[in-house]
């Protein structure tokens, strides 16, 4: 019999009820092409931390100067300050201190093209809107016009050549004059103001603008001020926090206010589909305090949707700290037969903010602001999380070999792709749902090696090792398997586990 790993993590069902390829544990693996591939490691952009706080905002901006030169800038927000990054030295320099922002903010931004140049507008909900136009003086500046005296814009969007702003903790939004993001043309109150407020603008298919409130979703109709009108899409869902939404495919994934689960939104109420309720039940593992909810972030990078959040067991059970410490990840191009994601859990990457660097020579790299220290991290350049081993664990479904007979398991074959260094991975098997450590062995995942100088190179592209079960722990009628590893420098892909079983005798019921 053959067990593959194509089904994703399912934590809401008993192991014996899981379907083909589903796993009761899948930690620090990505599911790709029907196999498990260890998640890439992280390495610091700035080896010297800015301090003991995290970084909730990372931005790579691209600008075209008058002489045609392309300028790339790295920006981070840390403890109220805006910093510029030096890609060569891996250091940060504080921008003009007169432009410092409120502490404990989570900045939001949009970019507007003006005369061929990109201008970044940044909002916190506590400060005046700041802008950065790629100037050679490395300065963020206060805006002019109506924005010079406005402190409560929390997020924004460019739509129909206008800047649209959300007023913090309010149902009021403002929109600018055409091609003039710093002067407000008018304001609109969306829905009822009592017990509700706007959280985030997004732009969907057909240049349709949506406003997610905390308890409802609205769509904008019309293309000129005289036609602008917001119509309710649904009042059964709302957005839990301003970073809890991300464009994915033909719609958006968002964190719902009411049950704290992820949903897909395609533009109508009937298009809304649950993404985590059936298999993950996010509300059971995520810290549900509003501070923790405000810290979530989402992104799509190289075909994988990633959702950073704080585990509710932070500070215990091996989940560190009072900060984002986990991610839920799935391959958006490889859904399950039901259309739902095949989730895996990433633990230890400690992500507070995402940033994809994808223009003018940047190689579509993912960088993240750490949630526990003042560093930003390159992803997929190393095999570990900033020098810390990545703890990998996968546990299969409970497979019934025979419904009415005891079987003898004669051998197990783990098939995978080895790494380039000599490592072992702990292999366990569990009989009849008894999760003990009796049936365990160490499996080498290095393959055969030849020494070339001081570098060991794997000389086989595949391992398919047979493991013999313990003789007095080889009879039962169901079995599951676990692989575990927590060593530095490990690389591995796992394709399947096969086992051979022979029926021995019928199961006898006992009565007392």
Model-identified regions with their sequence ranges:
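Beta-sheet repeat architectures centered on beta-propellers
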Residues: 1-91, 100-119, 236-252, 256-258, ...
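Beta-propeller and closely related beta-pinwheel folds
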Residues: 46-55, 96-104, 138-259, 263-295
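Short strand-coil-strand connectors
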Residues: 79, 125-126, 168, 214, ...
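Hydrophobic or amphipathic alpha-helical targeting/insertion segments
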Residues: 109-143
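Glycine/Thr-rich phosphate-binding loops of Rossmann-like dinucleotide-binding domains
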Residues: 130, 173, 376
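Generic macromolecular interface patches on structured domains
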Residues: 130, 226-227, 422
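Short, glycine/charged-enriched secondary-structure capping and boundary segments
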Residues: 135-136, 178-179, 377, 381-382
């Amino acid at each position: 019999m053959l067990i593959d790993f194509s089904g994703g993590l399912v934590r809401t069902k008993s192991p014996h009820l899981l379907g083909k390829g589903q796993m009761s544990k899948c930690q620090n693996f990505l599911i790709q092409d029907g196999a498990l591939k260890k998640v890439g490691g992280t390495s610091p952009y700035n080896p010297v931390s800015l301090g003991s706080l995290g970084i909730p905002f990372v931005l790579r901006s691209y600008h075209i100067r008058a002489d045609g030169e392309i300028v790339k800038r790295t920006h981070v927000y840390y403890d109220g300050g805006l910093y510029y990054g030096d890609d060569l030295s891996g250091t940060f320099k504080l921008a003009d201190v007169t432009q410092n922002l409120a502490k404990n903010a989570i900045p939001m931004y949009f970019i507007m093209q003006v005369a061929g140049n990109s201008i970044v507008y940044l909002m916190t909900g506590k400060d005046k809107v700041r802008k950065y136009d790629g100037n050679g003086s490395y300065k963020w500046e206060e805006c002019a016009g109506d924005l010079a005296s406005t402190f409560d814009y929390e997020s924004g969007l460019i739509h129909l050549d206008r800047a649209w702003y959300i007023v913090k903790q309010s149902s009021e939004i403002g929109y600018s004059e055409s091609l003039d993001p710093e002067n407000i043309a008018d304001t609109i109150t969306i829905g009822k103001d009592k017990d509700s407020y706007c959280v985030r603008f997004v732009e969907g298919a057909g240049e349709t603008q949506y406003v997610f409130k905390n308890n409802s979703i609205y769509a904008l109709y019309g293309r000129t001020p005289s036609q602008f009108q917001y119509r309710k899409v649904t009042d059964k869902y709302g957005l839990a926090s301003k970073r809890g939404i991300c464009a994915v495919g033909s719609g958006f994934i968002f964190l719902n206010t009411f049950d704290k689960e992820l949903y897909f939104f395609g533009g109508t109420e009937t298009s809304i589909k649950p993404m985590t309720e059936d298999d993950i039940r996010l509300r059971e593992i995520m810290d549900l305090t509003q501070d923790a909810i405000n810290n979530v972030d989402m992104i799509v990078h190289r075909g994988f949707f990633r959702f950073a959040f704080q585990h509710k067991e932070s500070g215990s059970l091996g989940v560190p700290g009072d900060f984002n410490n986990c991610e839920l990840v799935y391959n958006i191009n490889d859904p399950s037969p039901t259309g739902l994601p095949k989730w895996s859990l990433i633990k230890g990457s400690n992500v507070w903010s995402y940033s994809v660097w994808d223009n003018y020579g940047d190689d579509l790299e993912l960088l993240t602001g750490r949630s526990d220290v003042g560093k930003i991290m390159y992803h997929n350049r190393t095999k570990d999380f900033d020098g810390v081993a990545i703890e990998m664990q996968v546990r299969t479904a409970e497979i019934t070999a025979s419904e009415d007979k005891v079987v003898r398991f004669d051998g197990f074959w783990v098939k995978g792709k080895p790494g380039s260094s000599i490592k072992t991975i702990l292999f366990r098997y569990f009989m009849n749902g008894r999760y003990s450590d009796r049936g365990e062995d160490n499996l080498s995942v290095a393959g055969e090696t030849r020494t070339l100088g001081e570098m060991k190179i794997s000389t086989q592209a595949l391992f398919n090792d047979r493991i013999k079960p313990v003789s007095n722990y080889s009879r039962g009628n169901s079995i599951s398997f676990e692989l575990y590893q927590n060593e530095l420098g490990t690389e591995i892909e796992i394709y399947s586990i096969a086992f051979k079983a022979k029926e021995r005798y019928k199961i006898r019921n006992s009565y007392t």
